[in-house]
UniProtKB/Swiss-Prot annotation:
Domain of life per record: Viruses
Cited Pfam families: Flu_B_M2 (PF04772)
The name this protein goes by in its record: Matrix protein 2
Gene, per the UniProt record: M
Predominant subcellular localization, coarse grouping: virion
Keyword Transmembrane: yes
Membrane-spanning residues: 5-27
Topological domains, Intravirion: 28-109
Membrane disposition: Single-pass type III membrane protein
Alphabetically ordered keywords of this record: Coiled coil, Host cell membrane, Host membrane, Hydrogen ion transport, Ion channel, Ion transport, Membrane, Phosphoprotein, Signal-anchor, Transmembrane, Transmembrane helix, Transport, Viral ion channel, Virion
Coiled coil, from the record: 58-83
Matching Gene3D superfamilies: 6.10.250.350
InterPro entries assigned to the protein according to its UniProt record, in alphabetical order: Flu_B_M2
An example Gene Ontology biological process: proton transmembrane transport
């Protein structure tokens, strides 16, 4: 049988997780397409960059067909650091498509 303190700890954890999810969803819903965003992506190896560029390229498929062209477009807005990549100028929809690789989202003013 669980002790009252354990039950309280579990409930507190669940509420914290729900609050974080609600805050994240609410924050992303407020951001309209085209707002300038900065994201940090973990694991800045060649495969990660190629995968993220492919995801972004899919968003821009009508305008930009080649992955190499997209890399050139992103290169001005991409900063590769030791443990993550920073890409600026993305919309909320593009960030959501990246899923689990996103570490941090910051709205640029």
């Amino acid at each position: 049988m669980l002790e009252p303190f354990q039950i309280l700890s579990i409930c507190s954890f669940i509420l914290s997780a729900l609050h974080f999810m609600a805050w994240t969803i609410g924050h992303l819903n407020q951001i309209k397409r085209g707002v300038n965003m900065k994201i940090r992506i973990k694991g800045p190896n060649k495969e990660t960059i190629n995968r993220e560029v492919s995801i972004l390229r899919h968003s821009y498929q009508k305008e930009i067909q080649a992955k190499e062209t997209m890399k050139e477009v992103l290169s001005d807005n991409m900063e590769v650091l030791s443990d993550h990549i920073v890409i600026e100028g993305l919309s909320a929809e593009e960030i959501i498509k990246m899923g689990e690789t996103v570490l941090e989202i910051e709205e640029l003013h």
